[in-house]
Amino acid sequence: MAELDIGQHCQVEHCRQRDFLPFVCDDCSGIFCLEHRSRESHGCPEVTVINERLKTDQHTSYPCSFKDCAERELVAVICPYCEKNFCLRHRHQSDHECEKLEIPKPRMAATQKLVKDIIDSKTGETASKRWKGAKNSETAAKVALMKLKMHADGDKSLPQTERIYFQVFLPKGSKEKSKPMFFCHRWSIGKAIDFAASLARLKNDNNKFTAKKLRLCHITSGEALPLDHTLETWIAKEDCPLYNGGNIILEYLNDEEQFCKNVESYLE
């Protein structure tokens, strides 16, 4: 009686075992026994191709230079100051502890003096109203905070203890006059701007040198807050602070503009 021609021989040279239920490799289409069915066990030539492809793909992404950060981006995000590459989370100077970060104490001192001069230049009833408004802003913020907590948009994953709430007045000409939002108190001003722009679906060209930049401005003085400062820094200030539950302005300014004009018009 003739032997039935069933099964096939394993294609591994030193094996050649006949298997009645042979395995076909999905990559090289070779036929193998149970022992040699994996790509590694039969030395599949496609393994080398895949490994080379993975190595090539690694070169098309950009690693973050910040210590202990393993994030990679598909496009280069280069800090214009230290000229190193970072992920989106660490792209601002304060977030990656930039070696070129300068503490703008002289400029801030000059700015505070300018704010004081502007206020002092106001006389009579106008100046009186300004000071009265500043005095009552903390109380007003506490009253508004409860309402903001019910309606504000933000990152829902943030712990309640880290949230800070603002009624954000949007740039002139926007579809909405203002929008309630919450942020992490440890975020830099620059990061808060990016987040607010995303929530309000605003054009954000802050990474372009020639375009007008989105800036967060103080509701009382109109001062554009420095991008590298943190929100908690301004909450803790003794002179002209921000208040949790208070108002803040988001507006487009030129690079040379350090103040938002006509802040009263945003509240009308």
From Swiss-Prot:
- Localization: Cytoplasm, Stress granule
Binding residue positions for Zn(2+) 3: 64, 69, 87, 90
Tell me if Metal-binding is a UniProt keyword of this record: yes
Record-linked PROSITE patterns: ZF_AN1
What are the recorded GO MF terms, alphabetically? Answer: proteasome binding; zinc ion binding
Where, in this chain's numbering, is Zn(2+) 1 bound? 10, 15, 33, 36
Extract the SMART domains matched here: ZnF_AN1
Give the sites modified to N-acetylalanine.
2
Gene Ontology cellular-component annotations: cytoplasm; cytoplasmic stress granule
Report the principal subcellular site. Answer: cytoplasm
User: Where are the AN1-type-classified zinc fingers?
Assistant: 4-52, 58-106
Query: Could you tell me the superkingdom of the organism this chain comes from?
Result: Eukaryota
User: For the region ubiquitin-like, what residue ranges are annotated?
Assistant: 160-260
Question: Any idea which positions bind Zn(2+) 4?
Answer: 79, 82, 96, 98
Q: Which GO terms describe its biological process?
A: cellular response to arsenite ion; positive regulation of intracellular protein transport; stress granule disassembly
- Domain remarks in the entry? The ubiquitin-like region is necessary for its localization to stress granules (SGs) in a VCP-independent manner. The AN1-type 1 and 2 zinc finger domains are necessary for the recruitment of the 26S proteasome to SGs. Both the AN1-type 1 and 2 zinc finger domains and the ubiquitin-like region are necessary for efficient SGs clearance upon specific arsenite-induced responses.
Known role: Plays a role in the regulation of cytoplasmic stress granules (SGs) turnover. SGs are dynamic and transient cytoplasmic ribonucleoprotein assemblies important for cellular protein homeostasis when protein production is suspended after acute exogenous stress. Associates with SGs and is involved in the efficient and specific arsenite-induced clearance process of SGs through the recruitment of the ubiquitin-selective ATPase VCP and the 26S proteasome.
Listed name of the protein: AN1-type zinc finger protein 1
State the organism of origin: Homo sapiens (Human)
